[in-house]
Amino acid sequence: MKQSYFYLKMREHKLKVPYTGKERRVRVLLPKNYEKDTDRTYPVVYFHDGQNVFYSKESYVGHSWKIIPTIKRNPDISRMIVVAIDNDGLGRMDEYAAWKFQESNIPGQQFGGKGVEYAEFVMEVVKPFIDENYRTKSDRKHTAMVGSSLGGNITQFIGLEYQDQIGCLGVFSSANWLHQEAFDRYMERKKLLPDQRVFIYVGTEEADDTDKTLMAGNIKQAYIDSSLRYYHDLIAGGVQLENLLLKVQAGAIHHEVPWSENLPACLRFFAENW
């Protein structure tokens, strides 16, 4: 059935990052009829790599997550507020990893290690700002976070470190193999909450040019192994099976095209409890 056209309003904010002193763009996509339904509150989904979320012309790879058409073409998905936090460009690899990379083929170069500070920015600056300025359902159950590649890494970390505040995670093509041992040790020490919902996605043909500078081994297998290990460790830690969804997609590459194609399934999985 043909859906009537509707416009989704977007607002832009500049929030100061405490550890850099610089402002970071944070955009907020409002659900349909947000300004009319003034008594209604909404779940919130936070996205990393905000430049890649809305418009393909802004995306580094020329293709976005297509969140706006996803919402318009899938009216069955619960209405939500979408928050897109821009990455720091050249500082992205440092911010999206809580630990230094153990894998690197670049002599004299070390990446990662600022993920804890970035997580504090997201949870102590961005989330409170959103909850204070928008009609959110600010509780854990209705707070979700999505990221891909290194954005998946930081989603995993924040999802564990702040699991008392985040109820849903969308982890796409995590590059956790870059600091696998450190993440595994960290995860072993955490007491997991059984009702956190986690959507895990990985393709069988993952690997891009950046990956090849960081690892000499079988990168495609590393992506698969890392996602499977995460899934296994969540189960071992007590997360209930009905709260986990793992998808391994044959032939899928490390790119926004398959991520955007699988986003509706991720959002539906979140919304089952909304």
Features from the language model and the residues they span:
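Non-catalytic cap/lid and distal C-terminal segments of serine-dependent acyl enzymes
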Residues: 1-274
